[in-house]
Amino acid sequence: MKLLPREIEKLELHQAGFLAQKRLARGIRLNYTEAVALIATQILEFIRDGDKSVAELMDIGRQLLGRRQVLPAVLHLLYTVQVEGTFRDGTKLVTVHEPISLENGNLELALHGSFLPVPSLDKFPEVHEGVIIPGDMKYGDGSIIINHGRKAVVLKVVNTGDRPVQVGSHYHFIEVNPLLVFDRRKALGMRLNIPAGTAVRFEPGERKSVVLVNIGGNKVIRGGNGIVDGLVDDVNWTVLMETMERRGFKHLEDIDASEGIAGEDPRFTTMISREKYANMYGPTTGDKLRLGDTNLYARIEKDYTVYGDECVFGGGKVLREGMGQGIEQAEALSLDTVITNSVIIDYSGIYKADIGIKNGHIVGIGKAGNPDTMHGVQNNMLIGNKTEVIAGEGMIVTAGAIDCHVHFICPQLVYEAVSSGITTMVGGGTGPAYGTRATTCTPSPFDMKLMLQSTDSLPLNFGFTGKGNTAKPLELRHIVEAGAMGLKLHEDWGTTPAAIDNCLAVAEEYDIQVNIHTDTLNESGFVEHTINAFRGRTIHTYHSEGAGGGHAPDIIRVCGVKNVLPSSTNPTRPYTKNTVDEHLDMLMVCHHLDKNIPEDVAFAESRIRAETIAAEDILHDMGAISIISSDSQAMGRIGEVISRTWQTADKMKAQRGAIDPNMADDDNSRIKRYIAKYTINPAIANGFADLIGSVEVKKLADLVIWQPAFFGAKPEMIIKGGNIAWANMGDANASIPTPEPVISRPMFGAFGKAGSENSVAFVSKAALRKGVKELYGLKKRVVAVSNVRQLTKLDMKLNDALPEITVDPETYVVTANGEVLTCAPADSVPLSRNYFLF
């Protein structure tokens, strides 16, 4: 067959398309992924038929599916489908614009060549319920005035050339085409008063008036045609006139030119509606946007960009030499990469800003650009010739997620994790051994070396926990000094009070965290005896509700203990109608139990309680459970840490209303609380919050970029240590990056030595002093965790509630401060069927 990579990938696309056809044929309304796959697949098949042109196929692509054949959200997710195929005259691009534009599609065309039965249109009834628009924006009041307060002038301009001239917003107007005739003296130090990144076009012979405004910043002109090179105030007009005459630049004094101030006089003022502004640069202060297809709206609290001086990259746009891109910027201040105009969602706030990255770290958050021509540019956020641009307009940026409960059962976990937005994995294991299937322990120094070496080139941060289940300290010291960044106590190894006490004593000695999965059997004592064994020392309790393991039925009481940092694992996030039913078999497999042994079954059943799972939802919403993690392949799903966090937040808003009654028109308080659960709080709990866990200056640039409509489900790009490590990318042979199949793929930041350069291995201070980096031949940066032994629940950002919790041992009813915690299971959740193929 001699298949090329692009052919193999299109076979995968065809499989997805044929699956979508089968679902359509049985009357199933298609989701986003299915609709794209079906349309792209059919276009390729029509190309193979060989009797239709590109233009004909662009039209046919709009006829295949109608609004009734897709889920309601798809209309607001799917705007374009592109695919390249081999026509009679070679490979060509077919772009289908607005592919869902009819009430009903032509199902015979949609199923052409599949030999599947064409379903009756009666199988696709109208949908009358309210439609959630993923990524929907709601705009604040008023309009946006750009370049407010700047001196302005209206000049008449004539194009005396024989070809059109198009002038961008930030082009120094005195430097424009020599055959444009206007008063260049009045244009000195001025540019067009139009939205950043737009342009004015002058056709041959055309005469029009334009409004110019002062350039911003230091008012320095460089580049262009080079007729001015320096401060505007230093220009000698006589010398400049001689230069223009010698070089043929036309100038005509405009004695009727009017002058004023932009924003004060309507003649000189340019206003943009908030909707148009948001479509061009992303939402601004007071605007709100929906997160995915949830019912959560984030309101922009502050916009650090400058209206009229936004950084926009592209042909004829702002970030060009001498305009938004400075010339001969100071090397120390010039960025490696800038993410422009992004909405940042972080525990610290929800705001709009440019993000500056240098040497793999965030060096600035605010206004980037060229201080010679733009207002408000921060000193360390200069855009120069060395600066790469990631367009963040209309996008959301979050910190990379931290999963701090990982069973390292298989290396494929890494790819599922990073493609979902996880950039740090903490846990233990050695592969699919039975110990690892049940517990997050890397038990021996030999295994610790293996795990640090095997992950050395992977583009994520890693930290491994040793086994903590022994009543004597020697072996614990060995594993900590071999590289363990923490210790794990697990009931499958015997989490007895003696082991707990010894493990915590060693942790105090080495300044590392202890993670605990307590004794479901109550064999050595009840939950209060385990809490007593802590003796006030800091400990991180895994799956604190108990379905994942722990004292039955009341381990959830630890969520009210000050020295306990409680977390959840995601199978119980949120509580839904199928949550309980799936858990028994899950538990039997993970913990090597035998369904033929009654005591094993009783052990499993004791851990699965609808009442405590329901209470877990509410405790998260109260901020009494601080962290959400996965429990990967061991009663947890590593690729759903983020989505299940937001599903929980969505469910709690629907059932409990606003967290802050005074801010009921947005969900910022809830959003910041929930994002802290998988970013800053696991970073604090594990002792590396000074390096990762939030979008803050000086931290490693571990960032996730999302389209708002896909937020929480499928990220657009993952940046690891300042490098693009993973991203949605189309056909590698295509003429542009967007034709199908678009797949979440590793990028250059994930290949070769890049993963070692852009990521970190976390170890103990003792291991760092012993030189494990050199002993193991590690290329990754090796960093010691620190400052975890004095932590309390009060250090958990926005999740520090300490309710007094009780659990009835017979009915399992949970109360917090005397209030019964109960909620109904959800019938459906967002971030699910609209997006995923399976």
UniProtKB/Swiss-Prot annotation:
Post-translational modification: Carboxylation allows a single lysine to coordinate two nickel ions.
Changes seen on gene knockout: No visible phenotype under normal growth conditions, but mutant plants cannot grow on medium with urea as the sole source of nitrogen.
Catalysed reaction, written as an equation: urea + 2 H2O + H(+) = hydrogencarbonate + 2 NH4(+)
Keywords: Hydrolase, Metal-binding, Nickel
Listed GO CC annotations: cytosol; urease activator complex; urease complex
Pathway in which this enzyme or protein is active: Nitrogen metabolism; urea degradation; CO(2) and NH(3) from urea (urease route): step 1/1
Necessary cofactors: Ni(2+)
Cofactor remark from the record: Binds 2 nickel ions per subunit.
Domain Urease as annotated: residue spans: 400-838
Binding site for Ni(2+) 2: K488, H517, H543
Binding site for Ni(2+) 1: H405, H407, K488, D631
Positions contributing to substrate binding: H490
Keyword Manganese: no
Subunit-structure text: Homohexamer. Other oligomeric forms may exist depending on pH and presence of salts.
Protein name: Urease
Species this protein is from: Arabidopsis thaliana (Mouse-ear cress)
Gene: URE
